[in-house]
Design a protein with these regions (language model features):
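Phosphate-binding loop of NTP-binding sites
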Residues: 88-221, 225, 229-237, 289-290
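Active-site beta-alpha connecting loops in nucleotide-dependent enzymes
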Residues: 44-49, 309-311, 327-364
Length: 364
């Protein structure tokens, strides 16, 4: 595994030492401005900042330990010097993951992953103690932070994984070690970093590949049977779902005044999500809920009570207008879906405000 590959003996000892400290103070910070008493502060480097410059400020603010990688910093009781703070964060997260009995569901895809993640959590929390990625902390820093926020008594965690270059999902899987996986769909986001649609497909499928290659009793994949790039995925433990054709879990999409709904076995499941494209996100959450034995009535209740609050399919009413906020992120496929859905809504005067889309490379 990645941890043993990247660690010499000294590093493994440091991780164990760090882990015993983490168990007493299981709160991690990478931002010196928002440190709480007892936090472990990881001094990370970014394009415009270097956390090593804030080591002593972090201690003054109450950090119980600082992990840093600038050799100029003098050793102290609260300072753990290592080769690379980011690698140490990732390795600590993997070490914690290995101690957990928590079932981990990995989620990725071009569109809908954050909404689907939120829906899966509200559904599963009807029966289990759950945790899900906060916001979209889904990269090489966010995934370790998510793992390190999982208490030992968590039964199921839903970990979101994003990527903008080949190999990134595989790397995140090595850290999070998901037992189950779902890919919402495959579109054309971040194509600049991937180089081609084929590379996007290959990278997203690294999530399925990890689960298949590390098969255990819990292993399972959930396949969007309506997605051309995903429908032929083979694995002995898989569940397919579809809005258009016969699958393990089949439903029909409908829209009531702009809000996504699905009909499953004569049961109408409504939502507070604008846009018929959200029907897939609802169906994915239903499929996973059924897999884990959540009763249909509870699944329906969870989805119908969920209200988005993160500029994704969110509705705000003012005195004069109804605003639909779907502006957290954008790519050509998600934008097309949003506009088609908006076109089908009944309203006298409609207006669209669009921003730019970046990282599209050749297809700009």
């Amino acid at each position: 595994s990645r941890v043993s590959m990247e660690c010499n003996r000294e590093s493994i000892e440091k991780i164990k030492e760090l882990y015993s400290h983490y168990l007493k103070n299981p709160s991690i910070s990478t931002d010196s401005r928002s440190i709480k008493k007892g936090d472990i502060f990881f001094a990370l480097k970014g394009d415009n900042f270097d956390g090593n410059n804030f080591v002593f400020q972090a201690i003054e603010q109450g950090a119980s330990l600082v992990v840093c990688d600038n050799k100029q910093i003098e050793k102290g009781d609260k300072i753990l010097l290592c080769e690379n703070s980011l690698t140490m964060l990732q390795n600590l997260a993997t070490y914690h993951r290995k101690q957990l009995k928590t079932t981990i569901i990995g989620i990725s895809g071009t569109n809908g992953k954050t909404t689907t993640k939120e829906l899966i959590q509200v559904v599963l929390s009807k029966k289990f103690k759950t945790l899900a990625t906060k916001g979209n902390l889904n990269n090489h820093i966010g995934v370790p932070l998510t793992l390190l926020s999982i208490p030992c008594d968590t039964e199921i965690a839903i970990v979101e994984m994003g990527a903008n270059h080949v190999g990134e999902i595989g790397f995140l899987c090595d850290i999070a070690m998901p037992d189950l996986a779902i890919l919402t769909n495959i579109g054309t986001a971040h194509i600049e970093g991937f180089g081609s649609r084929e590379n996007i497909i290959k990278t997203k499928k690294e999530l399925f590949d990890f689960v298949k290659n590390n098969s255990c009793e819990k292993s399972h994949i959930f396949v969007n049977f309506d997605d051309e790039a995903l429908k032929d995925e083979t694995f002995s433990k898989k569940t397919t779902y579809s809005l258009n054709t016969k699958a393990d879990i089949s439903a029909k999409a409908c829209c009531e005044n702009g809000y996504a709904q699905i009909i499953y076995k004569d049961n109408l499941i409504a939502s507070n999500l604008v846009g018929v494209y959200n029907a897939y996100n609802i169906l994915a959450a239903l499929t996973i809920g059924l897999h884990f034995g959540v009763e249909l009535e509870q699944i329906k209740k969870a989805i119908e009570q969920y209200t988005p609050s993160n500029n994704r399919s969110q509705i705000l009413k003012t005195n004069n207008n109804t605003l639909i906020l779907d502006c957290y992120n954008a790519n050509p496929s998600s934008c097309t879906s949003s506009i088609e859905s908006f076109a089908n809504m009944e309203a006298n005067h409609k207006m669209v405000f669009m921003g730019a889309m970046k990282e599209l490379g050749e297809v700009s």
